[in-house]
């Protein structure tokens, strides 16, 4: 057994005993999650997998979807055109903030907050709602390596209770940030958040970004390599919401969280890491996930600015027996 596998099992045992946090019960379907679910998965850019826990337990991708839809919008419109519509500035505000709408620039601050994500989703090209949804599902398929499906009860739950997101969309319509067809954009946004994945899927998706846009399992390209830099930059500065600064300081990896309990992190050129545990902190991030990734970064020297290690601890742990 490799040192990395031993390390993951040790972290799983240690952090599974910690039960702080709350389920995301403002979405009724997410309140049904088992607080004991806990999984850690690492997929390397050469296709190796190291994992422990409930790695096959499915959950909805939620806000982690914003990363991949942003990449799709980049491919549809190009960097300059998309930047004119959605900024890349961190906010320091909660993900569902109503107030971070830049009236001067006529664009939301970044694509990782809900306002920016709704605007980004509204820009996805297609011949009507069904075509746009099919394009999104095909994009997710390339990242994951297999067909993906929407959890319809979660989608309906989000659509029925997503009044705050509707308020955000109407504010953006008022400021001229999105076009008038906001119900269609919101439905597509709720659908993308309701795509089912598991912890291993998330690790493969993160590893695809680490591997310059090529899925390390299927060898299929999911996104052009030129856009990966843009995606990872926004993940690094904005992916963990109002915890993004402390995350960059302590963990030092591009990452994205979702309120269903997933967190994925990218170790460029090396691996994708995913942790799933539905108990959340006050920022909407998985508490166990945050702690595992902090511990992995420190133990293996994964911080992008840890010049003494340069991520070599990960390779050493993989190679040991």
Swiss-Prot record:
The UniProt keyword set, sorted, is: Hydrolase
GO annotation, biological process: glutamate biosynthetic process; glutamine catabolic process
Q: What class of enzyme is it?
A: hydrolase
EC number of the protein = 3.5.1.2
Q: Where does substrate bind?
A: 63, 114, 158, 165, 189, 241, 259
List the InterPro entries hit by this protein, alphabetically.
Answer: Beta-lactam/transpept-like (IPR012338), Glutaminase (IPR015868)
GO terms (molecular function) for this protein are: glutaminase activity
Q: Name one Pfam family in it.
A: Glutaminase
Annotated catalysed reactions: L-glutamine + H2O = L-glutamate + NH4(+)
Subunit-level organization: Homotetramer.
Which family does the record claim for this protein?
Answer: Belongs to the glutaminase family.
The protein's name: Glutaminase
Q: Which organism is it from?
A: Acaryochloris marina (strain MBIC 11017)
